[in-house]
Structure formats: C-alpha cells, structure tokens
C-alpha cells in the first residue's frame, strides 16, 4: 500500500519532473546558440517523461485493484493518460531530433521549416494535455480506495467474472 509519506515523496518527484519539462519547453529556444546544452536539456527532458510514465505504471501496479486482477479497470480509467504520454514522448523526441539536426552546425540560422512548425504546435498541444492528464492521474492514484478492499471493487470484480 502507498503510505502517505511515500505518496508525498512520489508526488514531489513527479511534480519536479513535470516542472522541469515545462521549463525546458518554455525556455529551450533561448539556448539555441549553445546546441550542446540544448541537447543535454532535451535528453534529460525525454528521460524525465519516461521516468514519469514508469512512476505512474509502478503506482498502478501497487494498487489493490491491479493486485486482484482488474487490470482492465485501471486501463479503462487511465487509457487517455497512457496514450497521451506515449504520444507526447514520441512527439518530443521527433521534435528534439529535428531541431538539433537542423541547428547543430548553424545555431543562429533560421531553421523553422513548415513541417517543423507543425510538429512544434502538435508537441506543445500534446504537452498541455499531458500535463493535465498526468496531474489528474497522479491525484486519482492517491485515493486510498484503490489500495484497499471495498464494495465498489467487489462489484467490479463480480461484473468482470461474469
């Protein structure tokens, strides 16, 4: 079971990773003259997104709902967040690779092609949705009802067995 102290620590780590992600999304263009630093920030950002997904999955695996075998209930509840996380990670990696590829040798040259601008917009829209769904999922996974036996869980288990 996820204890209050542990949940607070996990929540703090998750929010720190989300804050760093938001920081990189907001200010990475200011570092276009230093491509190595920008590359390192992009790599750390992508690893942070991956860590956030791993943390959410570990929190899901820790629930009583998962342990009694109602994985479909969890997947139904968190499908949007899992899909958005994968989409956001994919869009971020694609955007980072494309920007660094265009900007590596000539960092002060205008590199914003039409395709890159479209990818940028989709990546930022996915980022906003990712932040919202991730925070909502994190708060929902803090619900103590997910970590203990309860009547609604017994009803869900009975429906799943039929």
Swiss-Prot record:
It is found in: Vacuole membrane; Cell projection, Cilium. It is a multi-pass membrane protein. Required for ciliogenesis. The chain crosses the membrane at residues 7-27, 39-59, 80-100, 110-130. GO terms for cellular component: cilium; vacuolar membrane. InterPro entries: TM_138 (IPR024133). The keyword Transferase does not apply. Glycans are attached at residue 6. The keyword Transmembrane applies. GO terms for biological process: cilium assembly. Disruption phenotype: Ciliary phenotypes such as pericardial effusion, curved or kinked tail, as well as gastrulation defects. Keywords: Cell projection, Cilium, Cilium biogenesis/degradation, Glycoprotein, Membrane, Transmembrane, Transmembrane helix, Vacuole. This is Transmembrane protein 138.
